[in-house]
Amino acid sequence: MAAGRAQVPSSEQAWLEDAQVFIQKTLCPAVKEPNVQLTPLVIDCVKTVWLSQGRNQGSTLPLSYSFVSVQDLKTHQRLPCCSHLSWSSSAYQAWAQEAGPNGNPLPREQLLLLGTLTDLSADLEQECRNGSLYVRDNTGVLSCELIDLDLSWLGHLFLFPRWSYLPPARWNSSGEGHLELWDAPVPVFPLTISPGPVTPIPVLYPESASCLLRLRNKLRGVQRNLAGSLVRLSALVKSKQKAYFILSLGRSHPAVTHVSIIVQVPAQLVWHRALRPGTAYVLTELRVSKIRGQRQHVWMTSQSSRLLLLKPECVQELELELEGPLLEADPKPLPMPSNSEDKKDPESLVRYSRLLSYSGAVTGVLNEPAGLYELDGQLGLCLAYQQFRGLRRVMRPGVCLQLQDVHLLQSVGGGTRRPVLAPCLRGAVLLQSFSRQKPGAHSSRQAYGASLYEQLVWERQLGLPLYLWATKALEELACKLCPHVLRHHQFLQHSSPGSPSLGLQLLAPTLDLLAPPGSPVRNAHNEILEEPHHCPLQKYTRLQTPSSFPTLATLKEEGQRKAWASFDPKALLPLPEASYLPSCQLNRRLAWSWLCLLPSAFCPAQVLLGVLVASSHKGCLQLRDQSGSLPCLLLAKHSQPLSDPRLIGCLVRAERFQLIVERDVRSSFPSWKELSMPGFIQKQQARVYVQFFLADALILPVPRPCLHSATPSTPQTDPTGPEGPHLGQSRLFLLCHKEALMKRNFCVPPGASPEVPKPALSFYVLGSWLGGTQRKEGTGWGLPEPQGNDDNDQKVHLIFFGSSVRWFEFLHPGQVYRLIAPGPATPMLFEKDGSSCISRRPLELAGCASCLTVQDNWTLELESSQDIQDVLDANKSLPESSLTDLLSDNFTDSLVSFSAEILSRTLCEPLVASLWMKLGNTGAMRRCVKLTVALETAECEFPPHLDVYIEDPHLPPSLGLLPGARVHFSQLEKRVSRSHNVYCCFRSSTYVQVLSFPPETTISIPLPHIYLAELLQGGQSPFQATASCHIVSVFSLQLFWVCAYCTSICRQGKCTRLGSTCPTQTAISQAIIRLLVEDGTAEAVVTCRNHHVAAALGLCPREWASLLDFVQVPGRVVLQFAGPGAQLESSARVDEPMTMFLWTLCTSPSVLRPIVLSFELERKPSKIVPLEPPRLQRFQCGELPFLTHVNPRLRLSCLSIRESEYSSSLGILASSC
């Protein structure tokens, strides 16, 4: 080639020498001598393409381009690239701009690629062909995609002028890249054009071919040629036995009659890439065959069959002499794609999809492993119902597709709002052009899980709506758990009998409910051939999203949002009660409230999911995921606490739970009138946690390799493996009592830092050793070492602080635990006192032999072997104090234990205040929590109520202390108030165990209706009840106005306190009336307050408001009815109209009338002063005096007053309202 030129530039000479070396090494057959003719042919081919655009640039050779082999691409090309031999830089820039404003175009590399186009991946047998295309040279094979394939190109050497190469993703180290061939390849050797047939090919057209199938018995062994237009092309189906596809030929497009042909010869599978709907073809040497397991017969290709373009001059229709009835038989027409809207069965919720063809561009990748994409920015595309593994690698924004016989589903639900196109096996997805954009940087969750998603479709047989929800749910789960808890490939791995997929296990409860296992397996032949068409996409039901898996941070934020959205001071303090509260009480009542949210409160319902961890900083259990952690309170079941530490590190899934939001508010509302003004709220914060029963949850162990490979933030607390430490020693102990978790001071050991230590979160445990120390032997524990003394009950005081605080929630009295110390055996490890944190005197008083500090690396296991069952049975019950000990003045043992239901929880002032609280100092009001509880006791029908106070350092209270919850209190301190009421306080020895959560639905139980005499029966009477009685007389009536800030009397709306510095001059009314009532069995003095006074006086709201307005002038009116007449304790005169009105009203039948009274005892059941005995009282009956024993009058507080059914009319005063 060089002989034809006098001089060759050195650069061209060097380029030609490199080209010759490359060609001889890469393209020439290795078994032959170097082919000297191949080099000039390749150079001429390159020059022809280089000069095809009329660009010379001073050289006839592309000197800036270099040859690249398949191996070089696979080894050295790490980034996606493209190469366009005939393009200038400006042409490439124009091409790249078409990638779109947000697209990232493929970078250009100046590379020359040559190779043989083949459908064989290697030098293998013909049967190994699966329809894929490859580019091959001497260095290797690389898979490729081509838009329009000419079957005559196979096996020939080509120059590829325009192509792009996409290397395997970084996460897929074992994968291979692929080529995208944009233009038709340029042959190095001229292609030989096969001459047409000498004689016309006898062919059958679809009508005759369909009729001929009826004569299958006469056509055995006979092969025919079929001709027609391609009207349908199925997907390429690959099963374990073989791969195949089915095409349908018709006379025209759209066709009235069609005939189906199965292509399953391996060498013919590549036809699938060459076929184009609407093009006419001839298929030669077809035979009639029956599909195994099917009734119908079909045409099928043979080994010698060929695919030819239909040329009318080269074919001749074969005339067949068939029987008349067969010719008259009307073959089944091909159903046409419907243009109507989705059909909807009016009698059900079943919808029918539309079947159509569509061409569009991919504008987004929604979930590549799941086969979900976006088309034209407005449609969804789901390829999961086809086997699209080969197509997945080219699918990215910018790819143009032609969809044949694709299903359109609208309003599928399940969180999907856009219409979705989904091809089944009958449809075909054909490439029209490749994307100019680089593949996106896929995250790990977008790269793994293809086999799991296929399992959902092909094994679980999910319909499209449920499949779309499942893919979304798996994405949510991957975001929650990967990669810190699990690796993506482990979470989304294929599920098998020996290795279940964790992702599928989390979805199984929902999937089993909506799509029970056992659905019929898809039959590919029926799905493609059967008429009418049946496939999983044909019918569907709109799916109401069953649930979602929010991150714990999202769940927490949504709970807080709902809690504060529902926070309404007016609802928490409804009128008329709030209008009588002074500012301090008003703000204290608003200071704490709570909200319980069930999963059904969210739309869709939320599923709780996280890894259970034990916090060593707070001593509580937490659920943790990628977004953070959420405190949780778990019970194994009702009245059974969580006690198995092996649950740490497990994945917990719960559909039934309570999301608790405790609201703490610091406010300065002057009065009830300003409750609607949020500006008076100074600070608000919330404590959010969840509580649920372990029996309602799904517990899944997380594989240990996943945890060890996680980052340091992994919630791993157990340093040992699942079989425990290989070396170590342990000892069993029975837990007798657990003290409160609180900050305590510890002694500083000698030689420690001189700095004053800060209080550390800790707790103590009192227990008894069961046997001696045991050493690790294999996977079990050896025999206990003999003890020096014969006392089997060796008490021990265990101290937990630092990291060992994490065991707090698992330790409960009455259980036997194994304390494990890893590492080499150390003599007397569990006997010696390794710390000086506690003095010997308390240990001696408790009868403890030793004090032991639990080290950070020690672990605990719950022991439940048969050897200790007797010990567990003997210590199973919780300690309970008798009701007599609780409600008595006996202080022999001031520590009491009992179970109770919490009735209310409020904030109150501290029990002991060293200094007077400053007015308005709301911070001081927050230092004490009062729980009013109803004791659980079988000694009386109506459980007595008791107040339990929690003060620092036990604040904030532990989780779960909510109204409606059942709780066991152990070792509370019993006290007696100055008014002789028994109450209890938390001490450092107090242990609280939640027995059950508040009920999800509250049922209002009416108060019992009793006679007043029943209240004289002591403990057998209810604390609150209803009685029908009659008001006999009024003892006293007080009406006054006070300052809402300092509660001093207000006259004419002004505070009368000396030196008043009240920030607001808001006055509120107060009212108290004392009545004498009787029901024929006993008498009672009833105290009514505020708005209940209006009901007692029989006044309507308007009259009551007018009366209070009149009282505002003097500020205070007190009427005493102990003697005759009324005494006015105010500046007003006795003969004033208001005084006369009140005196007349209180002695009129409008007040002295029958009523239905709801009340509670003024004397609390916890009061220990004995009841007043009956007294002698003189009665005068005419002239005769009588002496008789009379029971003391009951003292009641009014809860409500209703008019009796037998009450007479209230007269003019009431009727005027």
Curated annotation (Swiss-Prot):
UniProt region (Disordered), positions on chain: 328-347
Keywords, comma-separated and alphabetical: Chromosome, Disease variant, DNA-binding, Nucleus, Telomere
Compartment annotation: Nucleus; Chromosome, Telomere
MF (Gene Ontology): G-rich strand telomeric DNA binding; single-stranded DNA binding; telomeric DNA binding
Any matching Pfam family: CTC1
Cellular component terms (Gene Ontology): chromosome, telomeric region; CST complex; cytosol; nucleoplasm; nucleus
Superkingdom: Eukaryota
Broad class of the protein's primary localization: nucleus
An individual GO BP term: spleen development
Implicated disorder: Cerebroretinal microangiopathy with calcifications and cysts 1: An autosomal recessive pleiomorphic disorder characterized primarily by intracranial calcifications, leukodystrophy, and brain cysts, resulting in spasticity, ataxia, dystonia, seizures, and cognitive decline. Patients also have retinal telangiectasia and exudates (Coats disease) as well as extraneurologic manifestations, including osteopenia with poor bone healing and a high risk of gastrointestinal bleeding and portal hypertension caused by vasculature ectasias in the stomach, small intestine, and liver.
Function: Component of the CST complex proposed to act as a specialized replication factor promoting DNA replication under conditions of replication stress or natural replication barriers such as the telomere duplex. The CST complex binds single-stranded DNA with high affinity in a sequence-independent manner, while isolated subunits bind DNA with low affinity by themselves. Initially the CST complex has been proposed to protect telomeres from DNA degradation. However, the CST complex has been shown to be involved in several aspects of telomere replication.
Family: Belongs to the CTC1 family.
Quaternary structure note: Component of the CST complex, composed of TEN1/C17orf106, CTC1/C17orf68 and STN1; in the complex interacts directly with STN1. Interacts with ACD and POT1.
Name the record gives this protein: CST complex subunit CTC1
Lineage: Eukaryota, Metazoa, Chordata, Craniata, Vertebrata
Gene this chain is encoded by: CTC1
